[in-house]
Amino acid sequence: GGIEKSLVTLLSLFDYDRYEVDLQLFADEGLFLDRVPEQVHHLPSLFPGEYRKNIREALPILLRQGHPLIALCRLLVTFAGKTRGEMGDRLYRMWRIEKHFVRAPKKEYDAVVAFMEGQPIYYAVSKVRAKRKIGFIHGDYGAMGLNADLDRRYVARLDALCTVSESCRAALCKAFPGGDAKFHVIYNIISARFMRQMAEASADFGDSFTGPRILTIARLSHQKGLDLALLAAMLMKKRGYAFRWYIIGVGPEEADLKLQAKELGLSETVVFLGERGNPYPFLRACDIYAQTSRFEGKSIAVDEAMVMARPILLTDFSTAADQIDSEKNGLIVPMTPEGIAEGLQRLLSDGALRERFTAALSACDYTNEGEIEKLYALLEGKPFPAT
């Protein structure tokens, strides 16, 4: 996912002559594990990788491996995750169970960084002994459905809480009045040189289609609005537009989305490519990049599409304008199937518009590796650099 990719990019830039870094994962799984720099000391995970599997797969495997208590934890967490409430309520209920099954580190640290909302922040605050505690939230706190009443006690014990855009910082200020001084913006770090090198590989779309290609990179979840994308694709197909829409990613709604695509008659029009460790050749080869999310923080996939100078369409989620200046370097459209369809139809029909957006994006340098200095300042208890 985007957060994991952001973390790996951050770790790849760290000054290991200056810092010793331990990496604590909840479970050893993920597409980017092999990209963690060798200088990082990878601690044993809090749970086996199987813990993250679907409960029907996880339970028998954990029991066979001799982890009855972890199997019990996984079962209880499943029930907690299915109860009513917004995401923040569920994360908190899950942590109230998991905290009894996870160990605390033996040593004390100069600083701990919890790189994600929910359990990582709860763990860092509750279990880790450190002189400075820093949290990250990679989205719009309110739009994500997090619960300020539940999180307030944890936020109070952080020395800094970072997020990825000014809009996201404003959401934190609204959720936690009076906490402005500890809320900081550290943008997702982009290395354009690395991306362009990776993009030189071939893009295997798995077909011989020669028409316009639309690409989306997203977790297959409700947040990403892919159900809206499929309805938009149906409208465009009915109107006679020739295109293929490729989706890179996996997630909890994969089966439902594939069934929806089949029922809408889109089995050949929409192609699910699954997980791809290197999405950059696909970005280079696509004609349009579309992000149809219901909410985002500052989408890493959109940042990457900007670096690759692809014409971009975004739905009007709360932070969309933090990334795209609509009509100047992309389109921001209503968060409806009709809005998405009309925007994509404009891009498909107007080559000059696509070229204008590509030229505007190509004129900018999105590399921002200097953002890491902001984190260094927080780690060392120094004043946060002015932007």
Segment roles from a protein language model:
Residues 275, 294:
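Aromatic "clamp/platform" in nucleotide-sugar-dependent glycosyltransferases that forms part
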Residues 326-327, 331-337, 346-351:
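Conserved acidic donor-binding segment of nucleotide-sugar-dependent glycosyltransferases
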Residues 4-9, 212-235, 241, 252-258:
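A conserved mid-protein helix/loop that constitutes part of the nucleotide-sugar donor-binding site
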Residues 311-314:
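Short hydrophobic beta-strand element within catalytic cores of glycosyltransferases
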Residues 269, 282, 339, 346, ...:
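A short, well-ordered alpha-helix in the C-terminal region of glycosyltransferases
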Residues 132-138, 142, 156-198:
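Donor nucleotide-sugar binding/catalytic pocket of nucleotide-sugar-dependent glycosyltransferases
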Residues 304, 317-327, 331-332:
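Short acidic/histidine- and often glycine-rich active-site loop of Leloir-type glycosyltransferases
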Residues 289-290:
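A short hydrophobic beta-strand element within the catalytic core of glycosyltransferases
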